[in-house]
Amino acid sequence: MLDKSGFVMVHMKELEIQELSKENWKGTLLPVSYLSDYYYDIWIEKTEDGFHIPIKKKQFEATFRHLPEDGEYPDRLYEDWWENARAFGIVEDGTLLAAIEICPEEWSNRLLITELFVGEEIRGQGYGRKLIDLAKTITIQNKYRVLMLETQSSNVNAVDFYLHEGFTLIGFDTCCYTNNDIERREVRLNMGWFPNQESD
């Protein structure tokens, strides 16, 4: 089918999100990867009356690359330490194209997004937002007080996406991955979405 400009219009079918059972999907590797030309620089400075902690977007000298094999613990579904996790995803012809895993933190009444993956072949089509919206719906239905996730200061695209989806920065950890995360420009950022609270 041609549009008015003469270009071929391709209508792709809408992919459905389904729950991924622990029995079938436990241990499934999520090939999370990203490239980034920018990072959020974090610096902690002690002052006379407290601390000064500027966070500013800066450009990498060379493109930062995060590959699935990086790190001691690659991303997998239903890790043993997430005892009450649930996973949802998009599967086509037996291939996992996208997934989100959530797990309640019962003692604090918070819901954690423990994994979020969207394959390159379907990025930019709104499926990341749909997975996030599903987690938001579960947060509201179960009356959790906040929906939380972890990302990295090196993954500016992810940070900006979460901000656009109504999340806000609620904390960070400067030694989560190594003892020199600040110097490596890969600081863990904790972000949260609060039900019934408008984003500024």
Feature locations, PLM:
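Acetyl-CoA-dependent GNAT
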Residues: L29-T114, G119-E121, I132-L134, I138, ...
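Short alpha-helical
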Residues: K22-W25, S108, V156-N157
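Conserved glycine-rich acetyl-CoA-binding loop
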Residues: D93-T95, G119-D133, T137, Q141-N142, ...
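DNA-contacting interfaces and partner/effector-binding or oligomerization modules
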Residues: E14-W25, V32-D37
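C-terminal "cap" of GNAT-fold acetyltransferases
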Residues: H11-K13, R145, Q152-V156, E165-T168, ...
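Short, Lys/Arg-enriched N-terminal segments with co-localized hydrophobic residues
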Residues: D3-H11
